[in-house]
């Protein structure tokens, strides 16, 4: 996939894997959006280096075939080192929002319907 410019922001597609299926994530300027996946190759991971905001899939705490669990998502957060991370695509198996949110590292939070992310 080719990168494009939209409203003065570089839009860069990122190939990630949903189990064996290739799916797209996006980097739009200082924001990376990576959802519905469980694997990313090092060369694709390098494309999100320096993002300020990361939006990333974290389905639940237990391992899953085609999605990141919480530990896997947090490992990627440590590698990418954004200023702010929003976890998305959570299931009911993640736990109660306030309880899980209280356990997350600084700069990482559970998202919610209606959240507006400023970049």
Residue ranges with predicted function:
Residues 1-46, 113-119:
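Core dinuclear metal-dependent hydrolase active-site scaffold
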